[in-house]
UniProtKB/Swiss-Prot annotation:
One of its GO terms (cellular component) is plasma membrane. NCBIfam families: PRK06075.1. Belongs to the complex I 49 kDa subunit family. This is NADH-quinone oxidoreductase subunit D 1. It comes from Roseiflexus sp. (strain RS-1). It holds the Pfam family Complex1_49kDa. One of its GO terms (molecular function) is NAD binding. Keywords: Cell membrane, Membrane, NAD, Quinone, Translocase, Transport, Ubiquinone.
Length: 374
């Protein structure tokens, strides 16, 4: 009888397929994975402690550097938490601008994630460049509105930094003309490539019960068949006024996770159409006038208490928990990072698969190590 011996190998922390400084201790029997332990912390930057020694508004640019693909979404979550803590209202126009920016961010994120999946499976560069092409157009819009392409620091407590420039909406409409064909093109790349199908179908399956037990959220959870989306479960901003669907999968494998992301881009496109149509009729300005000078002439001092706010970021449920002692700095500042939580069931998803599948399964979770390690 053939006897085999288990072997422990390390993948990362310096590896081209780990999407950052991430280490996996993999126990293998031949090429088959027996166990996998994720090791975090190589990119820890003390984000929460920095926020606790900074004023509330000084923490806003730090959030850009959590998930640096989704700076607008990070800004939004912190803004909601502080507004809840301090009882700050947001003008209707600012709410619609916020939703517009976050949904553009969702398209940007998912386009990059699908491109990276194909890249990781050996479709070197070309499909990734399709996603990056659309991403660049969205970054141009962010630069037009905020002055920055990635670290936007655009949101403010009570609104946004400034109103949209006159040329923003015309350029956005021009971008949106090409998005439906881009979504179809990406879906065709997934559905009509036999090698890709064999590498993704029934690979990295995450059953819904396991997903819930790990508190997984976002596209990873919805791919497992659970229609949970914070925009519907606990509507914030103006999402309760907008019409969109929550796509779900049935198997919870790599294939489902990326089909979900493509369909979510289509739903973000629907939301953008509604926002553009309603934006001219919105009331109020880009920021609550009472908050216009916060950080310039005076500091924000919320009353003692605590608040938790969450949003549906492109990666999943992003939450900020704040405790105020009445000073200009938070007594406690805690981030619920979806990349970190979604990464915890990686061992369950990889067990029984081949070593070559680890890269594909990890890529399908869609993580950014800046958010994982904080």
């Amino acid at each position: 009888m053939l006897q085999t011996q288990e072997l422990q190998i390390n993948i990362g922390p310096q590896h081209p397929s780990t999407h950052g400084v991430f280490r996996m201790i993999v126990t293998v029997d031949g090429e088959t994975i027996v166990d996998l332990k994720p090791v975090f912390g190589y990119l820890h930057r003390n984000h929460e402690q920095l926020a606790e020694v900074s004023t509330y508004i000084q923490s806003m640019p730090y959030t850009d550097r959590l998930d640096y693909f989704n700076s607008m979404a990070n800004n939004h979550a912190l803004a909601l938490a502080v507004e809840k803590l301090a009882g700050i209202s947001v003008p209707q126009r600012a709410e619609y601008i916020r939703v517009l920016m976050v949904e553009l961010t969702r398209i940007l994120n998912h386009a990059s994630a699908v491109g990276f999946l194909l890249n990781d499976m050996g479709a070197w560069q070309t499909p990734l460049m399709f996603g990056m092409r659309e991403r660049e157009k969205i970054l141009d819009l962010f630069e037009m509105a905020s002055g920055a392409r990635m670290m936007c620091n655009y949101f403010r407590f009570g609104g946004v930094w400034r109103d949209l420039p006159p040329e923003f909406i015309p350029q956005l409409k021009e971008l949106m003309q090409g998005l439906p064909s881009f979504f179809d093109e990406f879906e065709r790349l997934l559905k009509e490539n036999e090698i890709l199908l064999s590498r993704t179908i029934n690979v990295g399956v995450l059953p819904k019960e396991v997903a819930v037990s790990y508190s997984v959220t976002g596209p990873v959870l919805r791919a497992s068949g659970i229609p949970y989306d914070v925009r519907r479960a606990e509507p914030y901003s103006v999402y309760d006024e907008l019409d969109f669907d929550i796509p779900i999968g049935s198997v919870g494998d790599v294939y489902d996770r990326f089909l979900i992301r493509i369909e979510e881009m289509r739903q973000s496109y629907r939301i953008l159409q509604q926002v553009i149509e309603r934006l001219p009729d919105t009331t109020g300005g880009h920021i609550n006038p009472a908050m216009a000078n916060i950080g310039k002439q005076k500091a924000l001092r919320p009353p003692p208490g605590d608040a938790y706010a969450r949003i549906e970021s492109p990666k999943g449920e992003l939450g900020f928990y704040l405790v105020s002692d009445g000073s200009e700095r938070p007594y406690r500042y805690k981030v619920r990072a979806p990349s970190f939580i979604n990464l915890t069931p990686l061992g369950d998803m990889c067990r029984g698969h081949k070593v070559a599948d680890v890269v594909v399964i990890l890529g399908s979770i869609d993580i950014v190590m800046g958010e994982v390690d904080k």
